[in-house]
Amino acid sequence: MANVVVVEEAITAAEFIEFRKLMGSPHVDSETARKTIANALYTVCLREDGHLLGFARVVGDGVLYFYISDVIVHPALRGGGYGIRLMNSVVEYLKRSARAGAMVVVVPLAGRESFYERFGFRQCSDGRFGAGMYLPGCTLRP
């Protein structure tokens, strides 16, 4: 893994679909994958000889609201510091892009909160914000 590079570039729809499958996330079609990739504010990848090993994406309005939507490393490579490399790039992007008072949000999988805490994130139940909420299944559209 000596040739692993961090590259600020979009991923392909096929890569997005493949990594969702690796994570056990619900399947999305190619059109949906293309749209979500195109709408990202920022994407950073880990690649070795052109092969995707992981990626992170940020979505939002690019000024005041930023949501870290994915920080995904191939399961075989977890624990090797690759997620940290991705997040370091995300944090640098946010420093360049976010205005004073911006809201930067991440919704980690249960048990992964400490990963984000090392980058300064706090759990929402700190008294200022509620615990955070989501719409299960997102069945607003087929």
Q: At which residue positions do the language-model features occur?
A:
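Conserved GNAT acetyl-CoA-binding A-motif
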Residues: 94-108
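A short helix-loop-beta-strand connector motif used in the catalytic cores of GNAT acetyltransferases and
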Residues: 35-45, 102
